[in-house]
């Protein structure tokens, strides 16, 4: 029966990682409930949700991922209504860390490595996710048009970003050392730096700048959005 799930997921273009996760969560549920899929009812579904939350003490976000996998199979593939009435647990929203403009400047001033400084500026100035930033290549940039292309953003979607005048100036100072247009902007031995390495750079910069907030890469993106709302002219800086 799960073969149908795998086939449908592949037809709809889900990634290999997502296909594997959906199959994994559905197998775990069937192992727990000890029934054939067509025999599963609403009580079974709720009992499993209670088990995940109360006994395994999984966080709502993790449970919701599992629930999405199960609902897709039972509702979309075999038209079983067992999970229709099961509501997703509420996920507590974390308040993002937002840095002041002064703190951003202090982080940049505290960073002596040119590549690390540009990495911080790029994420903040263009509002990039860390995964997007580390995967950027030189040929994703159009300096003349002051634009950049994100090829694999959230949901694997493409989008364009605006490059500020300051960022373009610093990119032009940094790029001459890179001759291959298909090269990653931020790389080590011709490979992109990892997300963990980028997080370490940002965390270290905040520490050197004397910032006591919990600062990770996403704080730069959150700060960009906040500052942009406060002053739309920043987009042209």
What do the predicted segments below correspond to?
Residues 1-234:
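Conserved catalytic core of the tyrosine transesterase superfamily
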């Amino acid at each position: 029966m799960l073969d149908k799930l795998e086939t449908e997921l592949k037809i709809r273009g889900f990634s290999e990682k997502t296909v594997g996760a959906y199959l994994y969560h559905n197998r775990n549920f069937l192992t727990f409930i000890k029934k054939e899929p067509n025999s599963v009812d609403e009580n079974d579904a709720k009992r499993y949700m209670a088990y995940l939350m109360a006994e395994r003490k999984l966080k709502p976000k993790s449970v919701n991922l599992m629930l999405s996998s199960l609902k897709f199979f039972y509702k979309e593939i075999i038209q079983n209504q067992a999970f229709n009435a099961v509501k997703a647990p509420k996920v507590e929203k974390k308040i993002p860390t937002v840095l002041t403009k002064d703190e951003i400047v202090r982080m940049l001033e505290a960073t002596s490595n040119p590549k690390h400084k540009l990495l911080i500026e790029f994420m903040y100035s263009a509002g990039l996710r860390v995964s997007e930033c580390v995967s950027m290549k030189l040929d994703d940039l159009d300096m003349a048009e002051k634009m950049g292309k994100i090829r694999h953003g959230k949901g694997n979607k493409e989008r364009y970003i605006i490059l500020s005048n300051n960022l373009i100036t610093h990119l032009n100072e940094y790029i001459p050392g890179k001759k291959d247009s298909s090269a990653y902007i931020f790389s080590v031995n011709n490979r992109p730096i990892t997300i963990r390495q980028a997080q370490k750079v940002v965390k270290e910069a905040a520490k050197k700048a004397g910032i006591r907030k919990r600062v990770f890469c996403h704080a730069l993106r959150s700060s960009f959005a906040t500052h942009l709302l406060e002053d739309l002219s920043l987009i042209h800086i």
